[in-house]
Amino acid sequence: MSGFRIEHDSMGELKVPGDALYGAQTQRAIDNFPISGLRLPREFIRALGLIKAAAAEANLGLGYLKKGQAAAIRKAALAVAGGEYDAQFPIDVFQTGSGTSTNMNANEVIAHLAAQAGTKVHPNDHVNYGQSSNDVIPTAIHVSATLLAHEALLPALKHLKKTIEQRARQLRNVAKTGRTHLMDAMPVTFGQELSGWAAQIGSASARIEDALKRMRRLPQGGTAVGTGINADPRFGAAVARELKKLTGVRFEAMESPFEGMAAQDDAVELSGQLKTLAVALMKIANDLRWMNSGPLAGLGEIELPALQPGSSIMPGKVNPVIPEAVAMVAARVIGNDAGIAVAGQSGNFQLNVMLPLIALNLLESIGILANVSRLLADKSIAGFVVNKARVNQALALNPILVTALNPVIGYEKGAATAKQAYKQHRPIMDVALETTGLSKAELQKLLDPLALTRGGIHGE
């Protein structure tokens, strides 16, 4: 089918593409907002479909829709949720701040699909019964972010943590020079270093799971301004129950819809925890880049898997591409969080009016963090190789090992020994034999790098 057809809404008639499943209100939004070409993500459209299906079931149970109407709406809404009609959601993300255009887009598409199947329903009077864009869109943010986090991000973080822990066990007895301020410090094992990364990821995951408890609370039922006008008082809880049946996630009605519509504090909180995860990933990525630096003029402690040529002009150069990608994702997520923080402040009186931006940034952050966490695990951490010769050479020349002699020879003599070793570029063991009066056997015991990674007071 080609050409155009005439649709109408409360503002009058409008031309709509002949093969479009949407109607006049969606077309007006397409015409009004040719801004970025960015659309609300697939996960958001999925959530909208699930909400409309749940609302139809709730309204059937409460006696506001006939069985045939509810069944037709549910079938069409679930098809939307399944991704069959994503092309019918063309509205730019930079639109009305309530997301009304996208809510009506869903209502029109679902009504059109129901009509094609033989049941005539109205976008507003039936598909949107008991609802407002002002509670549907915030609910869709909560549902979409919760589902994506549970299905993609949390499993990816679990995989990353497990991968780091496996490498930490493998390298638990391989000592290396520790560093503070990027300067040589007392030794640690690779296993200890990686255990810190694993703990960071575990803590980040726990924080995200805690924030998701609030995201499972839904403002559906608040309708226009939070009072629930034109909705059955039981509607919000009924929708939450139906969503639980559809997704397996224990959604519940928010005690105060006013909170969930006028503010987006739960989304702001979740975004903040995503930013914390991004900071942790940036730290891990930078550590890997430093450890891999070289191979001759850098630290050269590890060799990351070679994934692709690194230069169009320098033959043989290989770069740490995965850690670099991780760092860029982290920067993006931190920027997304800044946008969400500003958007979260835009809840003037009874409604936040930057909801589409919050949805876009939040879902992008969750998605790219999930993807890059798996890449970091599988293409960097699982496969890096330790350059033991380089690591051991640096340990032998590390004058800071003299710290272990402090309880025996005192700080000042230790400092003098360290300075002499550094100045002469000699192993600390050789210099200590000359300056401390300790035997070689005593020094070998006191300066054993692996023993020094176990903490405690040496020399007792």
Positions of predicted regions on the chain:
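Conserved, well-structured ligand/cofactor-binding cores
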Residues: 1-460
